[in-house]
Amino acid sequence: GKKIAVIGSGPSGLAAADQLNKRGHSVTVYEKSDRVGGLLMYGIPNMKLEKQIIDRKIEVMKAEGVTFVTSANVGATKAAMNPMVAKEDAMGEYLTNPEEKAVKADTILKEYDSVILACGASNPRDIKAKGRDAKGIYFAVDFLKTTTKSLLNSGFKDKKYVSAKGKNVLVIGGGDTGNDCVGTSIRQGCKSVVQLEMMPKPPVCRAESNPWPEWPKILKTDYGQEEAIAVFGEDPRIYETTVKEFIKDKDGNVVKAKCVKLAWKKDAKTGRMNMSEIEGSEYEVPCDIVLIAAGFLGSQEYVAKAFGVELNERTNVKTEAGAYATNVPKVFTAGAVSYTHLRA
């Protein structure tokens, strides 16, 4: 068997490590966080995925011979440590892992026969709107991570998370991560929650253009929206809407979001759907906390640069279609590091 390093312990990293170990290879998994699991551990709320399930799988993999190294930021320089740390409020402190150490890519390449990059698509898609620098605006992944980390570390006693208790919450993004933000905010005791979705409201049943066995493009009400309906009496989602401006108070805190309705029209030549703002449709939504769940753009570039692998236009690691090899010999990819999740 070969000595193989897997960089990242999310779903694809764990799957790759598990399969390679079963084929007789010696596998070491490197994780920059203080716990193994990646997205499974910190990106998905506990009420949706109990962490004892992840811990149990990790213990089984350890017993089978897989080695795990946590707080190891492979490819990072001192300046690149904790790249997701937000600058506003106390979020930076909450996200910081004091045990984190930088591990040189050259060291990994020399020590192992092959390397698998399984770092995920961890760059959150930002939004461009006036007032984006207001305090109280966070990426959804940061909000969810600090909440779960505080829960696991102290049962919330350390207060090292951003609480939505008594706050008006605005979630930007209609996907799974946005739904998790809605559910988490409600369980924290938010005053209100609104979830914005740029796309039109899906039909209840399949359209003729969306036959089986295609993925059903229909309206789905997930647990977060169901809880919002139970608590506040209405679905939190507002469709075909986006934010034009964040309004601040005198201290720079976000207090309102100026929204605008959108219209979608198919281009006769290309067949693509084009979006435009509806003139005169602006209105304001009160918000003390804004959570951006607008999808992801690609992997952390410093990891790719450290290993010398090429990136595509989406900042994902470049590989041939249907293949996993990079331009660097013995460096491969697994999972979302080489493709992008567009929705969050």
Predicted feature residues:
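Fold-independent oxyanion-binding glycine-rich loops
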Residues: 9-10, 32-33, 71-73, 118-121, ...
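FAD-binding core/adjacent interface of flavoenzyme oxidoreductases
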Residues: 1-7, 60, 66, 70-167, ...
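Long hydrophobic segments that form regular secondary structure
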Residues: 172, 177-191, 275-278, 283-289
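Conserved small/polar residues in nucleotide/adenosyl-binding loops
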Residues: 340-344
